[in-house]
From Swiss-Prot:
Residues 500-524 have a biased composition (Basic and acidic residues). Residues 1-17 form the signal peptide. This is Glucans biosynthesis protein G. Its main location: periplasm. It comes from Pseudomonas putida (strain ATCC 47054 / DSM 6125 / CFBP 8728 / NCIMB 11950 / KT2440). Involved in the biosynthesis of osmoregulated periplasmic glucans (OPGs). Residues 525-534 have a biased composition (Low complexity). The lineage of its organism: Bacteria, Pseudomonadati, Pseudomonadota, Gammaproteobacteria, Pseudomonadales. GO terms for molecular function: carbohydrate binding; catalytic activity. Pfam families: MdoG.
Length: 559
């Protein structure tokens, strides 16, 4: 490795620590300069290769960074190839210095890929992987990969790679076109033998943005990445995406495949979950629409949001190769107050599973001014234990099923009636605790583009929850249709309890309470009840209690 000068990082006789401020200084300096697009130094044989050939280039694990050191984490590297045609700079940070990890073609086996060794000796790496013994103590497995733009993917114990996170999104789904900032340089702290975390710094650059990022990786059953970011804009943007997630949804029970397929579902994520600042929980099943769809959910100070994979049984996917049931959900937990803004969901048409077509991010209402730094911090959970990120005291949506709407005739034959039916199963411990004859009812709202022809709720003994059947007749098929539903029930209003005088002894307090209760009873018999008191028929006053998260679905246009 080549040593890099540490000007300004330490003074004589003093210890120093590389930190986010060092990367932010670089980002600030870059922001004041004209953007320079990265230059590719990749020979045509690598740039024009097909994916199958790119896969033949194999990194030699025995030559991983820190392979001979007693560190819990190791690094392996991606070779350039295909559209990964621009090198990134990768540095190692130790207690005393920063050194660049130089490209070495001897770390790779090229198979039958024809190439001239002279043209590869100064190429540089396209990205890197983090290795850690997450599944077996004697086996280094990939737990994080950083490759392309500002993308990174992470897994926990027993997971397989699925959706991705990004550093920043700019003007996503706008007619002007999206700008993809990229991580151009990394600094990785060399871990100590007993360390359970790995710290990675990254420098971000794009035509209209620069930024400094600190990613603290903590592997486990759920792997966590703590993200600190400090970003500068070179110029104004129209839409800013903070904590962006990118995933894939091809089809599933709420939008079955149009082509006969043995798989019941094919997706990396099935829904967007939002925990709003006001405490509301919302669940939005994903679609693969025929036209670009953008949904904005206004939220102030979000408590969390994420793209989730709730179905965890092999039978939900039936795919022995891709194991969608093992692909993690990603949950964003903001640190601090993020203010007013929206969680935005972008759904893009795709014909196959090779294209990521789902994007979700936080979009601040007030956009930062160019040149002024803005900071966001959040914890990113990669999990297959979704109930941990659902309201413990509310039921949630177990599944959404779509079907052709029909009516059962007198001869018991079902006759389609031109409607579309949605069956929504609400489940969870909060609902299972209720008796099956509990007076649970649905609370629904449907946009102007549809007429509700059935709203039926019944107990589901298989889930110990309730199944909502909602049938709609769409008015204009070329328009999308919004709908929402939640389950509620009436519960008695608890009478207000009088405050006790702290100076009274226990006996006096007990006597005063009893005396007051008698007077209250006499008064209740003599006086007319107030508007919010118990009804005159003797029934208890009630209030409506929300039992579940809100199911929010958009039926795409032209379906």
């Amino acid at each position: 490795m080549a040593s890099v000068a540490l000007v300004g990082l330490m003074s004589a006789g003093q210890l120093w620590a590389f930190n986010l401020d060092d990367v932010a200084a670089k980002a600030k300096d870059l922001a004041g300069q004209k953007y320079e697009a990265p230059k590719s130094n990749l020979p045509a044989v690598f740039r024009d290769m097909k994916f199958a050939d790119y896969q033949k280039i194999r990194f030699l694990q025995e030559k991983a960074e820190w392979a001979k050191d007693k560190t819990p984490f190791k690094l392996s590297f991606y070779h350039q190839g295909m559209h990964f045609d621009t090198p990134v700079k990768i540095n190692e940070v130790t207690a005393t210095k920063v050194e660049e990890i130089k490209y070495d073609p001897d770390r790779f086996e090229f198979g039958d890929v024809p190439h001239d060794p002279e043209t590869t000796k100064n190429l540089g790496y396209a990205g890197f992987r983090v290795l850690y013994p997450i599944n077996k103590a004697d086996k280094q497995d990939e737990i994080m990969t950083l490759l392309g733009a500002s993308y990174f993917r992470v897994v926990g114990k027993g997971h397989v790679y699925g959706l991705s996170a990004r550093g920043l999104a700019i003007d996503t789904a706008l007619p002007s076109g999206e700008e993809f900032p990229r991580f151009t340089e990394f600094w990785v702290e060399k871990p100590k033998p007993a360390d359970k975390h790995l710290v990675i710094y990254a420098l971000l650059d794009s035509p209209r943005s620069t930024g400094a990022y600190k990613l603290t990786l903590r592997p486990g059953n759920d792997t966590v990445v703590d993200v600190q970011s400090r970003v500068f804009l070179r110029d104004h943007v129209s839409r800013l995406g903070i904590a962006p997630l990118t995933s894939m949804y091809l089809f599933g029970p709420n939008q079955p495949s149009k082509v006969l397929n043995y798989r019941p579902a094919l997706h990396d994520s099935e829904g967007l979950s939002i925990h709003a600042g006001n405490g509301e929980w919302l669940w939005r099943p994903l679609n693969n629409p025929k036209h670009l769809a953008v949904s904005n959910f206004s939220v102030e100070n979000p408590r969390g949001f994420g793209l989730m994979q709730r179905q965890r049984a092999f039978s939900d996917y039936e795919d022995l190769d891709d194991n969608y049931q093992k692909r993690p959900s990603a949950w964003i937990e903001p640190k601090g107050d993020w203010g007013k803004g929206s969680v935005d969901l972008v759904e893009i048409p795709t014909a196959d599973e090779t294209n990521d077509n789902i994007v979700a991010f936080w979009s601040p209402e007030k956009l930062p001014e160019p040149g002024k730094p803005f900071e966001y911090a959040y914890r990113l959970h990669w999990t297959i234990d979704e109930p941990k990120f659902q309201a413990p005291d509310l039921g949630w949506v177990k599944q959404t099923l779509r079907s052709t709407g029909d009516v059962k005739q007198s001869n018991l034959i079902r006759q389609p009636d031109g409607s579309v039916a949605f069956l929504v199963d609400f489940a969870g411990p909060a609902l299972a605790a209720l008796p099956e004859d509990a007076a649970v009812r649905s609370q629904i709202s449907v946009g102007d583009n549809a007429e509700v022809v059935e709203n039926n709720l019944r107990y589901n003994p298989e889930t110990k929850g309730w199944r909502l059947t909602l049938r709609l007749k769409v008015k204009e098929a070329n328009k999308s249709t919004e709908m929402r539903a939640a389950l509620v029930r009436d519960v008695p209003v608890e009478p207000a309890k009088p405050a006790q005088d702290a100076k009274q002894d226990k006996a006096a307090a007990k006597h005063a309470k009893a005396e007051k209760a008698v007077k209250a009873e006499q008064s209740a018999k003599a006086e007319q009840p107030a508007a919010d008191a118990a009804p005159t028929n003797g029934a208890l006053a009630t209030t409506e209690k929300v039992l579940t998260e809100t199911w929010s679905y958009q039926l795409p246009a032209d379906e």
